Amino acid sequence: MKKYVCTVCGYEYDPAEGDPDNGVKPGTAFEDVPADWVCPICGAPKSEFEPA
């Protein structure tokens, strides 16, 4: 699974880790992250992420 990076702040979404503090379980591919999920650092929408 590919990692994705927030183009606003540089936060890296790692599918192996997910974002459990915000309801995304480890092992969740970026494509399967809910559409309303936002960057946990800066609040940017999912659309601001690109493949690492």
Swiss-Prot record:
N-formylmethionine modified-residue sites: M1
UniProt GO cellular component terms: cytoplasm
Annotated localization: Cytoplasm
Gene3D superfamilies, sorted: 2.20.28.10
MF terms in GO: electron transfer activity; iron ion binding
Residues engaged in binding Fe cation: C6, C9, C39, C42
Keywords per UniProt: Cytoplasm, Electron transport, Formylation, Iron, Metal-binding, Transport
Record GO biological process: alkane catabolic process
Required co-factors: Fe(3+)
Cofactor note: Binds 1 Fe(3+) ion per subunit.
Highest taxon of the lineage: Bacteria
Major subcellular site: cytoplasm
Oligomeric form and interacting partners: Monomer.
NCBIfam families with a match to the protein in the record: RubredRD (NF045768)
Family: Belongs to the rubredoxin family.
Job of this protein: Rubredoxin is a small nonheme, iron protein lacking acid-labile sulfide. Its single Fe, chelated to 4 Cys, functions as an electron acceptor and may also stabilize the conformation of the molecule. Electron acceptor for cytoplasmic lactate dehydrogenase.
UniProt-recorded name of the protein: Rubredoxin
Organism, scientific name: Nitratidesulfovibrio vulgaris (strain DSM 19637 / Miyazaki F) (Desulfovibrio vulgaris)
Lineage start: Bacteria, Pseudomonadati, Thermodesulfobacteriota, Desulfovibrionia, Desulfovibrionales
Encoding gene per record: rub
